[in-house]
A protein has these predicted regions:
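ATP/nucleoside-binding phosphotransfer catalytic cores, i.e., glycine-rich phosphate-binding loops
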Residues: 173-222
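Ligand-binding beta-strand-loop-alpha-helix segment within the catalytic cores
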Residues: 1, 51-124
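Glycine-rich beta-strand-to-loop/alpha-helix junction loops that act as flexible
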Residues: 32-38, 125-129, 180
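A short secondary-structure junction signal
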Residues: 104, 133-139, 187-191
């Protein structure tokens, strides 16, 4: 279930995301954060108006902790770590210096425990031009896995991924999705197209087909 929220540009979109998150997130909420180019957490999280019970990372590009292409470094550079430390919010990142499969196994246990602890779960998400979301790529294991977390190699510039699965996303209460730029237009049209129903081919149509309320914030006219 998607509500489209039209904005002028990325800056306005992140401010709108902040306003929506203020209404959705409270201290008994697990807030899951994605990487990507659309979100600016310095704006989206703001200074002190959003107070989740815990923060976790939706997906990661595998490597050493805080490697230069990691989502966790992006989040750190955008102030998420400082935000969590300042307000004593527990935070959970993926990379811990273990091998590929062991990293996923450890994070799976963390996510299972977080899902038991927090009934309310809200995700900040993105959508790729190939309709991937999180680290769930077309025809990937994570699109059909019975687990909450998967490690797999996908066709991408950063192939080794650890990600929440579609099954895990199905546990959420709300999503705030940010997608900007004319290159996303065809992809977003597919997400909203009632004739597109293959989530293995186009994982991001999950947001339309699911009963979970999602807010799609975009500068693209659809």
């Amino acid at each position: 279930m998607i509500k489209v929220v039209n904005v002028e540009d990325r800056e306005e979109g992140n401010k709108k995301a902040h306003d929506i998150l203020k209404k959705l997130v409270e201290n008994k909420t697990l807030l899951a954060l994605s990487g990507g180019t659309s979100v600016d957490y310095r704006v989206t999280l703001g200074q002190n108006e959003i107070d989740p019970g815990a923060i976790c990372v939706v997906d990661e590009r595998f490597g050493k902790p805080f490697h230069q292409d990691s989502n966790e470094l992006l989040l750190k550079n955008q102030g998420v770590k400082d935000f969590a430390d300042r307000f004593c919010i527990e935070s959970h990142k993926i990379l811990k210096g273990k091998d590929f499969l062991e990293t996923a196994k450890v994070y799976e246990k963390e996510i299972e425990d977080l899902f038991k602890k927090f009934k309310k779960k809200v995700g900040v998400m993105g959508i790729g031009v190939n309709l991937h979301t999180a680290g769930i790529f077309p025809y990937s294991v994570s699109a059909k896995s019975p687990n909450f977390v998967e490690a797999e190699t996908v066709e991408d510039t950063f192939p080794k991924r650890i990600t929440l699965t579609l099954k895990a996303l199905g546990e959420f209460m709300n999503f705030v999705i940010l997608a900007f730029g004319k290159e996303k237009k065809d992809s977003l049209k597919k997400v909203l197209d009632e004739k597109e129903n293959d989530m293995q081919k186009n994982p991001a149509i999950f947001y339309r087909k699911s009963t979970i309320k999602s807010f799609l914030i975009t500068d693209v006219l659809l």
